[in-house]
């Protein structure tokens, strides 16, 4: 389990202390033709390994202020950032699920952008007490996105705790745009392997 030693620490150790895995991961992030998305445990892993920060500085996630596992439906504001995946969603507010015990961003003084913020700083709307209401970060080059909320759990309207009546004809929620944006970037950059 990736949380036994703390958020993603065991998983991170598998990369840090395995020379072959560490080299493969480092090479992946050095390439200019890659994208990555870390959701929840993936976000924790990216932060623990310093994959969002250009100087590879580790920024471990902290326990939620409530000191318990938080699971619920919240809203996030998608910020203006250089995120390839979120570029068409900038300045929108969308509902999304959270489910984590260590999802608090703190000590956010680094070389990255805040890509998503919880819509309110008050608990339970900011379920973990993250600094600056941060829900997700993106690397300066826009290609690597780390977020605690689960966008994969709100792709279909029926998955959402609330979906606007005026959009009841939607087959997919606006969150699908993150994956469409990624696909378009891959096509625009002629990435085939």
Q: What does each model-found stretch correspond to?
A:
Residues 1-37, 43-54:
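Flexible gly/pro-rich beta->alpha loop and the following alpha-helix that scaffold active-site loops
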Residues 41-43, 151-152:
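Short, glycine/serine-rich, charged loops/turns that create anion-binding
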